[in-house]
Curated annotation (Swiss-Prot):
UniProt protein name: Glycine--tRNA ligase
GO MF entries: ATP binding; glycine-tRNA ligase activity; protein dimerization activity
Top-level taxonomic group: Bacteria
One Pfam family this sequence matches: tRNA-synt_2b
Xref: NCBIfam families: glyS_dimeric, PRK04173.1
SUPFAM superfamilies for the chain: Class II aaRS ABD-related, Class II aaRS and biotin synthetases
UniProt GO BP: glycyl-tRNA aminoacylation
Binding site for substrate: R100, E158, F205, E206, Q207, F208, E209, E315, P316, A317, V318, G319
Main location group: cytoplasm
Subcellular localization: Cytoplasm
UniProt EC number: 6.1.1.14
Swiss-Prot/TrEMBL keywords: Aminoacyl-tRNA synthetase, ATP-binding, Cytoplasm, Ligase, Nucleotide-binding, Protein biosynthesis
Entries under InterPro entries matching the protein: aa-tRNA-synt_IIb, aa-tRNA-synth_II, aa-tRNA-synth_II/BPL/LPL, Anticodon-bd, Anticodon-bd_dom_sf, Gly-tRNA_synthase/POLG2, Gly_tRNA_ligase_bac, GlyRS-like_core
Length: 446
């Protein structure tokens, strides 16, 4: 079984190597807010690029859009978020901790159920509770500078609604037949009662959501097709360890207000088996709601059937930070080599923030080694150069941050115009002529 370490191991590892830092750390930090450092920002960008390449690039039926973070209050009335996007919470009067009710007891589904259970506070073990109440997760703000001209608006909790309200615009502009999809990357915001577990649940996060519009009769087959696509991406592109993944289909009683069917890919995070990527059949709920509230038709005309109807929507949705965290957990390991422990981040070659490192064996060879670096830097790979520390320590650091190949320029290189390439995962070393390096990486970069 794949090894999963406790959360603090990943937090400290990612901070030490420049992937993720506590936000506002010099001011004692902002609770559950994280900055992506030099390596983390590149890795996050590579994950997004991989998503784009797999799900969008060169796909005639998938269209990319970008919509604003701030949307009209009416959008969220129509979507049901103002009424339904709530968590039920309760406060412990003894220790002042606040909890989501379902975190205390998963059997409690609503406020009316609370009094049926006698539960102790998970923190102080008392039974001294406040009244149970609903808490809306939307962040709200105002636009306008004059008091009587101010309007209430909300920061989006998902990118999906921006895609839905542009359905007819895109249909008219691109003339697509069903099924077709609108895809979107973007920041979303949720005023979570209990954010936590590192990158798993934060108030500000980035999403990738695809909205597939289809005929109602095609919804089930499209759902299954997207399920296969998501699984292929996780296992063949990100190379997530399948031992850490599990599919879970929700009962009807567990579904969100808009959903007809939902299946999640769960991942074994340090805090347990939790949602990584969700796939929902949203039916025609969203288009029907926006049609009703906007008084604008959201129907699709099928010329073959000679009729108008509201398409069903199949939605794969994932948080980029959760993918990032899952990739780290799946890729990171500690092992003993020659009685020494090394940390290894076995990222897929295409995702490595730094793919190749060029190392002079000693500083005397720095100039010649840098010439090799300059040659490789002109290629499409992400290449770095390092001279600090012994060659062994530089190998260990390269392994820890996920660099797949180390290219070492040694004294023999002055004679044979060749270098030693070391593989991060196998530790196999081989001698390659400097002039053949671009071709070698083109063939073996994987």
């Amino acid at each position: 079984m794949a090894k999963v370490y406790n959360q603090e191991v990943y937090v400290q590892f990612l901070k030490q190597h420049g992937f993720v830092f506590q936000s506002s750390e010099i001011y004692n930090g902002l609770n559950n807010s994280w900055d992506f450092g030099p390596l983390g920002a590149v890795l996050k960008q590579q994950i997004k690029q991989a998503l784009y390449n797999f799900f969008i690039k060169n796909k005639a039926d998938v269209l990319l859009v970008e919509t604003p973070i701030i949307l009209s209050e009416l959008v969220w009335k129509a979507s049901g978020h103002l009424a339904n996007f709530v968590d039920t919470l309760v406060d412990c009067k003894s220790c002042k901790y606040r909890f989501r009710v379902d975190q205390i007891n998963a059997e409690i589904k609503a406020k009316k159920d609370w009094n049926s259970f006698k539960v102790n506070c998970p923190n102080c073990h008392n039974q001294n509770w406040s009244e149970v109440r609903d808490f809306n997760l939307l962040f709200q703000t105002e636009i306008g500078v004059v008091n009587n001209d101010k309007r209430l608006v909300f920061l989006r909790p998902e990118t999906a609604q921006g895609s839905f309200i542009n359905f007819k615009n895109i249909l008219q502009a691109k003339k697509r037949n069903l099924p077709f999809a609108i895809a979107q990357f973007g920041k979303s915001f949720r005023n979570e009662i209990t954010p936590g577990n590192f990158l798993f649940r934060t108030r500000e996060f980035e999403q990738f959501e695809i909205e597939w519009f289809c005929k109602p009769d095609d919804a089930n087959s499209l759902f299954e097709k997207q399920l296969i696509m998501v699984e292929q991406f996780l296992q063949t592109v990100l190379k997530i360890n399948p031992e850490l993944l599990k599919k879970h289909e929700y009962d009807q009683s567990e579904l969100a207000h808009y959903a007809k069917k939902t299946t999640d890919f769960l991942f074994n995070f340090p805090h347990g088996l939790k949602e990584l990527w969700g796939l929902a059949n949203r039916g025609d709920f969203d288009l029907k709601q926006h049609q009703e509230f906007s008084k604008k038709s959201m129907s699709f005309f099928d010329s073959e059937l000679n009729q108008h109807f509201l398409p069903f929507i199949i939605e794969p949705a994932v948080g980029i930070e959760r993918l990032f965290y899952a990739l780290i957990v799946s890729s990171y390991r500690r092992e003993i080599i020659n009685e020494e422990e090394r940390e290894v981040l076995s990222l897929p070659f295409d995702l490595c923030p730094e793919q190749i490192i060029v190392l002079p064996l000693v500083n005397k060879l720095k100039k010649e080694a840098f010439s090799v670096f300059e040659t490789l830097a002109k290629t499409r790979w992400r290449v770095c150069f390092e001279t600090t520390g012994s060659i062994g320590k530089r190998y260990r650091k390269a392994d820890a941050i996920g660099i797949k190949y180390a290219v070492t320029f040694d004294f023999e290189s002055l004679e044979d115009n060749a270098v030693t390439i070391r593989d991060r995962d196998t530790l196999v070393q081989q001698r390659i002529a400097i002039k053949e390096l671009p071709q070698w990486f083109m063939k073996n970069g994987q």
